[in-house]
Amino acid sequence: MPDVTLTTLQGLKQSGEKIAMLTCYDATFAHTASQAGVDVLLVGDSLGMVLQGHDSTLPVSNEEMAYHTACVKRGNKGSLIVTDLAFESSHSVAQTLADAVRLMQAGAHMVKLEGGAWLAEPIARLAQMGVPVCAHLGLTPQAVNLFGGFKVQGRQETQARQLRADAIALEQAGAAMLLLECVPSVLAEEITQAVKIPVIGIGAGAATDGQVLVMHDMLGLSLTGRSPKFVKDFMQGQESIPAAIAAYVRAVKDVSFPAAEHGFNA
């Protein structure tokens, strides 16, 4: 199978084939997931919670993100690697640019930034430098304290209108992909149709161009014993982790996941 590139993802959006994305933090899982057909591996700052045991993603450093990106690169067999810029990277445009370069040098093919239209400047600068960017809208975990917790975003019309505007503004700034987290399914569908770039959803319904889950969540692993509403345990009925990951890929591709029960109403 040829390596997945940004052009591949754009082609999948145009053809209507769904994009399967999973978080990944090490070489062994990168090898397993890429061999199972996962299109995109997300080296997420969620590692702060599922690997390090923090209650948010805020303590994660960009150097830790680079370390895990390098680990994933060594095991990857053709998936596109997207890496989160850490919370500490957002205090200035100069810092964002420098940290993005560090992640690309570590093996990322694209970096992910959380936030709204205010990200237009760093996204435009990164695009000029040849660094593809995935913009992350909706529930952005790095802003959990501003939101007052992990809550669905975009239910109020003013919020929904702002998210639509932000998506279009960030695409115009040069974002190559968009991730929508915990927004009403109807709103996610509207945004997916409004932009030309691939849109990946998590807790955003089935109408986005693809889906992403935290690897540990979809394998039924949790520090708290509770899973978010948008998660399905793909280990159920499977004999191995590779089989569970392959089942996830199939479910995303045939649109049997997510079901209505995994999404949110407006």
From Swiss-Prot:
GO terms for biological process: pantothenate biosynthetic process. Keywords: Cytoplasm, Magnesium, Metal-binding, Pantothenate biosynthesis, Transferase. GO terms for molecular function: 3-methyl-2-oxobutanoate hydroxymethyltransferase activity; magnesium ion binding. Its cofactor is Mg(2+). InterPro entries: Pantoate_hydroxy_MeTrfase (IPR003700), Pyrv/PenolPyrv_kinase-like_dom (IPR015813), Pyrv_kinase-like_dom_sf (IPR040442). Catalyzes the reversible reaction in which hydroxymethyl group from 5,10-methylenetetrahydrofolate is transferred onto alpha-ketoisovalerate to form ketopantoate. This is 3-methyl-2-oxobutanoate hydroxymethyltransferase 2. It comes from Pseudomonas aeruginosa (strain UCBPP-PA14).
